[in-house]
Structures are given as C-alpha cells and as structure tokens.
C-alpha cells in the first residue's frame, strides 16, 4: 500500500466518524519555546488548554513534524528521522478513552475492503500507564486483547507531554509484532525492534509545568475538560503495510537512496555499514530540508536557519564520502518533490524556489570545503614537521567549527596522509560546545516570560483590543505586576499599588494600544487615572502580548498612584500611531512591488515597522540590480499616489487564501483571519496590524538600500512619510553643495565626480610608478654596495618612502637577483610616518647551505623593533612598532651573519 493511500484511509476513517479534517500547520509556529512543530497536537494546544473554543468537537489531521535533537544518530540506526508525518485524531471534550480505543482498533484491524489497514489482531500489543486500570479494561473489552498483550510502563514511557509546559496525560501505545527475525518474544518491554510502535493514544487530561526530564516536572492540575490526542507515525505504519525492514525502504525514502546510488555507482544495503549510513543521512536530510525551505526557512547561522544549513551540509558531506564530487542537491530536491508531491502539493508549486535555495547552499559549502582542504593540508604538514603522527583534537575541532570542515573528511584525509586524528579530544571539545549550547538554550527558555504569574488573568479572558476603531479607551486595571510578580490588591494610599517613579506592568481589560507583533513595534501613549485617582498618570513604553490574548503595558508611573480595579483612560500617541501605520502600510506596498518586479518567489522572511521607517526581509538569491531597485521604488510610489482605499475585513482562513491573500510562512493563523486589502489585487495580505485608510497617507517611500542578511535572504530598508521627505531634502542639500564646490549644474555632478576620480587614480598610478622606479634604483645601488662578511654578501638597509610589506618583498626579489649565486642575504626595513615598521629578510640557496635561514634572522629584527615575524628559510617577514630600533635591528643581522660566517 502506497503512503498516499495510507494517508487517505486514515483521514477518510475519521471523517466518516464525524471528525473535521484540518490541514497540516507549518512546521514553524510563533512560539519561543518550540523550534519546530514536533507533534500533531501542537496546533490544537489552545483548544486543549481552554484558551480558545474549538470550532469543532473532534478533528483529524496529518501534521508535518521535525525533531532534530538526535540528528547525529540519523542513519546510524534506522529508527531516527528528522522529519516525520504524524497522523492524529483529536477530541476536545467529546469522546475519551473508550472512543479513542474503538476508533484506533477499527482502523488497524478492519479489512482493506472496509477501509481499514487489515492488520492481524493477534500481532497487536499495547502498553498503558502503570496505574491506568481503565485503559487495561477497555483494551480487553473493545479489542479482546489478553492481559499478557497489555503491558504497564512508567511515566517516562507512558505519560506524554511536548517536553515543555502545556497539556499532558497518560498514554496507551499500540505495537505491531514484526516476527521473531526482528528480536526475542515478550512484548515491547523486551524488544522495541520486534514490537514496533505504530500509534500512541494520549488521554490528555492534565497540565504540566517546567521540568528537565520526562519524569521531573510538576502536574499543575486538570485541564478544563478531558481530551484525546493520538499520533500515528505515517512512516512507521508504512513500513508495516509495505512489509519492509525500516522506513528507509518505504516509498517515501527509497527513491532518494536510489537517486544517490545511481550517481555514486555504489549499491545500498550490501553489507557496507558506513556507506549505508551515508545513504540514509542523505535520504532523511534531503526530505527535511525540502520541507523546511518550503515552509519559509533559509540557511543561516542560528536557530532554524542553522538547523537547515547543518542538514544540507551533512547531505553534501555524505555524498562526497560516497565519492560524489558533482553537484547533486538539485537532483535530490527533485526526487523528494516526486515522492512527497502527492501529499504536499506546495513542494511541487514552490519547487523552483526550494531547489534554488538548496543548490545555492551546496555551492557555498563546496567553496567552504575547498578552503577547508587547503587549511587541512597546512595543519597536516605542520603536524608532520613537528614529528607527530596524530592531528590534534583542537585542530580537528577548529576545522569543523570555524571552517565547517566535517570530521569524517578530516579522518579520511588524515588517513591518506599517514596521520591519525585525536578523535577523543575532538569529541570532548564537541561535547563541551553542545553543553554550552544546551546551557544557552536553557537560559533563553527560562528567561522567557513566566506565564504562571499571569495564568489567572489568562484564564479569566482576553484583553479587548479597541485600537482599530479608536485611540482613546476607558478601561479597568485587571492586574499590576512588578518584576514578574503580581501586586496584591490594596486600597489607595496603602503600600502595595503602583506609585510615582515605579516601572510596572499594567494589564487592562481593554486597550487601544497596539502590542508588538507582526513586525510592527508597540504603540507609545499614556494611561491616566479617572475620578478620585485622576492625578495618576503613566507613560507607556512598551506593550506585549502574553499567551496571545493578554495585553501587558510596560509603563513608567509619572504621578499619582494606580491600584488594581481602577478605571483608567488608555490613550495612544496620535503622532506615533500615524507614523507606525505609515510604516506598516508602506511595508505592504514594498512587498507587493517586489512580487510584481521579481515574481511570486520574493517571499517575505521578516519585517520591522516603526514610525517613518520600514525594514523588509525576503527570500531571494543575489542582489537586486540597480534597475530592479528603481522599479520597486517606482511601483511602490505609483501605488501610493494612486490613493488606493485600504480595506480591512475578517474572513475564514481558507476563503481568504482562495481570494489570493498572502499568508506568511511560519505564521500561525486562527480559523477567522483579518485581511488587509490595498488597491484590490495590488496588495492582499493576512495582517493584524494597524494601517492608513488610503495609500496616499503613506507619503513618499524612499528605499535607502538593499543588502544580504544571510544565505538566500535579502533586506530592503526605506523611509516613509515625513522621514522620507527629510531624507530627500538632506540629499538635495548635499547635491547642491557638491554642485557649488565643483562649479557645475547639479545634473553634471556625477560626470564631474567620475572625471575627478579617474584623474586621481591616474595621478596615484603615476605616483606609484615613480615611487617604485625610485625604489628599484635604490635596489640597484644597494646591490652594488653590498657588504661582504666572510664569504657572504649582505644588503642590510633601511628603506624610506612609506614602503609596504608587499613593496619590500618585491624589492628583495630584485636585489637578490642582482647578487648572483654566491651566498647572499638581504634584510630591508621600511621607515615612514607611521609607527608600524615592516621588514623582510631573504636568503638565497647558497646562504642556506651555510646554515643561514631567513626565518631565524627575522627574529633578530623583531626583537630590536618590538615586533613579530615568521616565514621560511628563503623568505621571512614581519612588522614592529618601534622605529627607533631600526639601526639596532640591522646591526643584529650583521652580527648574526658574522657569527655564522665565522668572521671576528
């Protein structure tokens, strides 16, 4: 049974049972605690916690999931995958344990003709949480499972959570007996290779707190209602139904392996474990990379971008270790598209962009490997010269960490040169790096806002945002927080409120102040008391959302006192809001213009909007041409001047997308969304920000620059409105000043400047020619006046004229060539206006035969001028910082030559 048929049967089974089919969410969600979506229930968390009312009592989905903590284990075993599909059914207070068990059993054991998977009931085992007697009884009643095929396990195995605070509960896992060839009998507690887990039924009934392990966390209490969250690994059930040994032999991953095998001309699964590991790494990581790029991730140096970069580099590295030097990533992306396209049509529709980004990373990494190879050769040569036979762990780590050079290639190349590698030292340094990374991640996690302080208010209901309709609202203070702790309710005049000079957080029941989100920074404004507390006034410096529902106002209390329960007036600074709306609406204009000029692959990757300024990041390979940049600016301003009406309305998510509304990769949207339309089809986006009422209010948009901020990601910055005018006025004044100084009309300034630059370069070139001619004449004179110390001819001379190290090397070559084949040494030191003193020494082969080495002599120079230097026996150089030591340095060289030449 093909995987697309397995998926269809799953969804059809639950839709027939009354479930609503919900599309997979992006693997990227707006959650600081979650790098990637790693479970099917993630998009339903607000329903489980009771934060939002689900629009359906039951649901089913097949969620894209990514887990990367065990990335180094991928390929070594066949059990680890970085990407997997989690088929699930969910109940939000509807059915519970009995319903979940009945539905799962029916799908697994019903015949193919009846829409099931047709598994043998006698080969199915289950595990349950150790004290869940109800689940044991239900498995016996519903499925007729004997007691010996129902095994009890502890919290680590059968009590499920996402690993972070949130919903949790006991679980029951379903296993399929693959037969004695895979391991001993005795059920899952004996062998999870023979007894393969295919489905996990989680009886979601509690909420957990912070914890460091699967068992070390506090149960905070019951959820508002009992829920069901199940997860069936599509790849797992596929290997059972396709009767293959592991997921890499299924129709999802085997095509990628076959593509690699054709290029490598090496067979897979013929007893070469190391090659098989590489095949599996390529298959797994290629698929994950395609999904990540498809969901809007670009290769980078941190966060999600770093994970993607690491995956692609492991693919390229593994291919090279299989003997593939040619580019292969493009072919891999095409194979993934063909295998996954029936289930994920976006991989087909967006293939050109996905492939372009992946291939660009391959090209960049190949350059890294080339430079790393050169560095390896230097390190290996240095190791051998020292007499060692082992490349240090430190060198291997530097190659890996700084230059991206894979340890496997280091090991292979070291073996080819007769060296070993201190793998233990390397692994220790890698482990230390991982420990630091985990500590940093833990610190970031715990630095995130402690939601428990706000839990009572979150549970009580959301803040009503009134800022789309008014800039001034009457509100009630629901809570006051200082340093993350709630201030007890007190009466006015009693210590415990928020008084003058304090910096506090105020939570209101309603507010017109926009909370930072969607790239738009928070509003500034004021919160003022009313009635008997009208003297109270606070300046709002920031507004943030807690749990996406609660507006937290960070304020400086300027006068009076605030107490929980007070009625206040929250007001937005009108000038601030006007500038913010100009910036945000301008961003939509620039986005639309970029897509019009570059095409639909110019996908938004981030933005920042503040009064008078916008910053827009988008996925694109390579810089914009001058013509493209001009077009973008022109299209943007034409749309602004067209005075388009800006219309906002709410719509169902699916309908909004069908209308052509742009939904940003990685964003999590509710079922009902806010749509912002500017000029009909010109710009249509899902957006929760504040905007102008017509595009003319944006004012002029001036693009300041366009640059790269990472692999495949570009950034446009622009001024809007009055800030744009001021920028243009400043540039106009600058141009007028240049025209006046150059005594030409403004339109002739560029040509005049170009002419001046050309003349300046010609003058500099002529000056350089004269300087070098003078230096060569000096070289000729120096060679003619060479000292003879014993049988060695020596030129030891200071050079004037501000010579550089490169100049000295050139002159040394000239002088040495004029001294003939007898033993000769040249030592030159440059003097000039700067304190830096460059120097160089050369010794010809005849001098080296006498034991004179340039790299030894350069050390004599270095001591006298307080510098450093190095090189080889024939040529060495360095620089110092003490010009007064030049004469002493040259004398030191003469003395050293005299000693070696044995002249008294």
UniProtKB/Swiss-Prot annotation:
GO terms for biological process: alanyl-tRNA aminoacylation. Zn(2+) binds at residues 584, 588, 687, 691. Its main location: cytoplasm. Its cofactor is Zn(2+). Its EC number is 6.1.1.7. Belongs to the class-II aminoacyl-tRNA synthetase family. PANTHER family: ALANINE--TRNA LIGASE, CYTOPLASMIC, ALANYL-TRNA SYNTHETASE. Catalyzes the attachment of alanine to tRNA(Ala) in a two-step reaction: alanine is first activated by ATP to form Ala-AMP and then transferred to the acceptor end of tRNA(Ala). Also edits incorrectly charged Ser-tRNA(Ala) and Gly-tRNA(Ala) via its editing domain. This is Alanine--tRNA ligase. The lineage of its organism: Bacteria, Bacillati, Actinomycetota, Actinomycetes, Mycobacteriales.
